[in-house]
Every structure is written in C-alpha cells, then in structure tokens.
Design a protein with these regions (language model features):
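Phosphate-binding loop of NTP-binding sites
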Residues: 14, 24-25, 48, 71, ...
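N-terminal leader/targeting and accessory segments in enzymes
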Residues: 2-123, 127
Length: 243
C-alpha cells in the first residue's frame, strides 16, 4: 500500500477531492493520532495539524506542561498505555493516520493494536518529510547545536522576510513555541540524525553544525555516523547549498 495513499497525492500534497460536495467535511475526516505526543518534535507536528483543522489525539507516558498546552489547543491526550483509551473518532483506519516516535517500543500495546487493525503507521520523520515537500527547506543537522541554530534561522527568516515556518526541537523564547507558522514557502527544520531521521529530508539549504561521535547505539561507529551526514548533504536539491 502506498504511504498516505488515502490522504496525500504523489507529490505529498494534501488530497482533498475538488469534486466533493462537502470538501470541509472530508477535510475534517483526516485524523492524526500520535504515540509519544508529548515529545518536543511530535508536539510540533500535533500543533501543525491542529492549526490545519484536523482532529488530533495521542498517548504519552507522562503529563507535562507541553501536553497540557496541546490539550488546551484542542488535542485529546491520555497517559495510560491501553488501546481502550483510544478515542472512538480515531479507531477507523480509513480516516486516521498514526504517527509514532522511535522512542515507542515495538511491543507497545497501542502500537500493536493499530498494526493489527490495518492502520497507516508512520514515523515522525516520515510525516515531517512529507510536510516539507513543496517547500524551500532549510534543514539544520548536527550532533550539537541543532535547536539553537534552527531557531536562529527561523528568527532571521521571520525578521527578514516577514514570513516562513519552522519545526523546532525546543520551545523558542522568541516564538514561545516549537512551531512557527507563517506565509511563503520557506521552512526551517531541525534535522535529527537519531535513527537516521534526517534522511527523510531533501533540503535546499543544509546546515551541519557538528558530526561528533554520538548515537553509536544506532550507528555502531563514528565513521558510519559521518557517512550518514554525507548522505544527508548528498540529498540537497539541485541548486541548493550546504553550510
């Protein structure tokens, strides 16, 4: 089955049938459920879909200030690992996509339930990759300094162009959020090397702050990590630049 076949077209753009008599109703039927919704990267995606008018729900192990904020913004969040806690509106595989973080174990009860019932299940990095299609992507990678640098890029973009969006790996003091939504195609993204997530991005501008030995539980050797960064640089779009 093609990834996001019921929601995205081949360019990764939102599929909303133009001949539908009720386009808004159809749009609202696209629900997103997050496993690990309280994570800094996951919550930014959740906020994006809330802004888009989607129904959003999810699970996290621990209630936090961030999950409280997401709930206040409209998400339904629970903290008990139990498929019975999944809201009824998110129990239909025809209308719900499940996004999970690599931190969620393979034997997680809710993840197993979604798999057993035929849901479309994608990693956070996959969803971010799809959402970045059609954008001018400024991706910041590196074993240290990603969040600070991405926030600087987002702030400069905002101040210079008056627009642009960003998915941040921290709560920016300037924006008071980990999500920035603005006009135009420019998108600043924190490109995480953990689990090779950044290889889901095809940037126009790629920034690498550092490539020190890290996440060796994933890569095995420092050389393998450096090779992944080289692959990331190799995915720069034609006419793009690396910094």
């Amino acid at each position: 089955m093609k990834e996001f076949s019921n929601v995205f077209d081949e360019r990764g753009e939102h599929r909303i049938c133009s001949d539908s008599a009720e386009p808004e109703k159809q749009r609202m039927q696209f629900n997103v459920y997050f496993l690990g919704i309280g994570g800094i990267g996951m919550s930014a995606l959740a906020r994006y879909f809330l802004h888009e008018g989607r129904r959003v729900a999810g699970y996290d192990r621990v209630r936090s200030h961030l999950t409280d904020q997401i709930e206040a913004e409209g998400a339904v969040v629970h903290y008990e690992e139990d498929p019975a806690q999944i809201p009824v509106d998110f129990r239909d595989p025809a209308t719900t996509i499940v996004v999970y973080t690599p931190a969620v174990p393979a034997d997680h009860a809710e993840l197993r339930w979604f798999r057993q019932n035929g849901f479309e299940i994608v990693k956070r990095s996959q969803m971010l990759g799809y959402l970045s299609q059609g954008k001018f992507v400024m991706a910041v990678a590196g074993t240290h300094g990603k969040t600070t640098t991405t926030t600087l890029v987002a702030w400069l973009n905002h101040r210079v162009t008056g627009g642009g969006s960003a998915f941040l790996g921290g709560i920016s003091r300037n924006f008071s959020s980990n999500l920035v939504l603005g006009s135009g195609r420019r998108l600043a993204v924190e490109a995480d090397e953990f689990d090779r997530s950044f290889l889901r991005l095809w940037p126009d501008v790629a920034v690498v702050t550092s490539a020190d030995a890290d996440h060796l539980d994933i890569y095995g050797t420092h050389e393998a990590l450096r090779e992944a960064f080289s692959q990331f640089i190799g995915q720069i779009r034609e006419g793009g630049v690396s910094i």
